[in-house]
A protein has these predicted regions:
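Conserved beta-strand edge residues that scaffold enzyme active sites
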Residues: 45, 118-119
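Short acidic/glycine-enriched loop/turn segments that link adjacent beta-strands
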Residues: 47-49, 269
Length: 288
């Protein structure tokens, strides 16, 4: 019926955040210094042309992503890296990539995919397996606040959520928020809301859109709001616009503070690693 839109019943909340970097191994070393346990380095299927390290939590995770060779699939990532490193995109969990892409098409959007790919996995017991995925992307023009979004169907969760990789010296347990710097935070939040069917809210001039379920929030700031939230020393090296910060829940804030050492800056009830220490991304820890 004209004027109606299909519900996005196959989008289940934020799945993982992609931090795109120029030197994958150097980035891994930086994030280990923040107290994270990283997976062994992975190499995606040839058509993707990328490699990664993952930082696994309870239901979500971070992905450090690097380009290994040029392909059509990684062209947007290469364009992103011409300007900066940092949070390039966020994935949502989908239980059916084909159906999710069809839901977008029913709304008049042109999804990219689904695309099937995988990567070999070295298991803690010395064995080998494979992680397999189906993904689809919203059109590149639909990037709220400058952050691309896509959806990921995990076909082999047991080769991604490995218990030994979910234990971190900093106590990290989940992604609480993905924070986005936008000239028009209200407009960016409303854009995200339209794309994922989650209502926006506002408090003290800060706009928020929940990603779904018990997963992370997207929080949108203008430059003044971002400067109020983070001291100058924390914002050093952060992106001037787009996704700029992560808030990570920790079961032990003292452990997170210890893991960060002299890199950490305590403020507003949290402890933050400056963007200069995390590939252009402010990484903050809050007690959960």
């Amino acid at each position: 019926m004209k004027g109606c839109k299909m519900p996005l019943k196959h989008i289940l909340g934020a799945d993982h955040v992609v931090i795109t970097v120029r030197d994958l191994d150097a980035a891994a070393a930086q994030w280990r210094k923040l107290g994270f346990t990283l997976s062994p380095r992975g190499t995606h299927s040839p058509q993707m042309g990328s490699g990664n390290y993952t930082i696994m939590f309870g239901e979500d995770y971070l992905e450090l992503l690097g380009v290994l060779h040029e392909t059509e699939q990684n062209k947007p990532t290469r364009e992103f890296l011409k300007n900066r490193e940092g949070i390039e995109r966020t994935a949502f969990t989908t239980d059916d990539a084909a159906a999710g892409a069809a839901d977008l098409a029913a709304r008049g959007l042109v999804p990219l995919g689904p695309v099937h790919f995988g990567r070999p996995v070295d298991l803690p017991n010395g064995g080998k397996s494979e992680a397999k995925f189906n993904v689809f992307r919203w059109p590149l023009s639909e990037s709220p606040g400058g952050m691309r979004i896509f959806a990921c169907q995990h076909l082999t969760r047991n080769t991604v959520w490995i218990p030994e990789l979910q234990k971190h010296a900093n106590g990290a347990s989940r992604i609480v928020a993905i924070e986005i710097l936008a000239a028009d935070p209200r407009g960016a939040a409303e854009h995200m809301s339209r794309l994922i069917d989650e209502p926006p809210s506002v408090a003290d001039g800060v706009f928020r859109v929940h990603s779904g379920g018990k997963r992370a929030d997207f929080v949108f700031y203008d430059a003044a709001g971002f400067a109020k939230r983070y001291p100058d020393a924390v914002r050093a090296g952060a992106a001037p616009e787009g996704a700029a910060a992560l808030v990570i829940g920790t079961s032990d804030l003292a452990a997170a503070t210890k893991a960060l050492g002299t890199t950490g800056i305590a403020h507003h009830g949290m402890v933050s690693a400056p963007a200069s220490a995390a590939n252009g991304t402010v990484v903050s820890f809050v007690a959960q």
